[in-house]
């Protein structure tokens, strides 16, 4: 995770991919930009990299929190969730809402 975060931090100069599903877009970027990627693409990939490492860190945090047998409830709760759906409206019709589900790490 530290190398992924480091690459994401330096997204102005490097491209980081954390999902093989992004390979096709990377190849298109390289073809369209004379072997380079755009800053917008690098920013989007950096955001995905940080999301991936945050989910990993949350999973580790939860493992340690629940590994402590002396506590009924952990002192803090860290979760990583993914948007599953954008809902028609929130609690009231003028509000926006979305449904989030636990992310698999």
Where are these regions (language model features)?
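Short alpha-helices
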Residues: 1-13, 18-22
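Active-site loops and adjacent core secondary-structure elements that bind or stabilize anionic groups
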Residues: 21-105
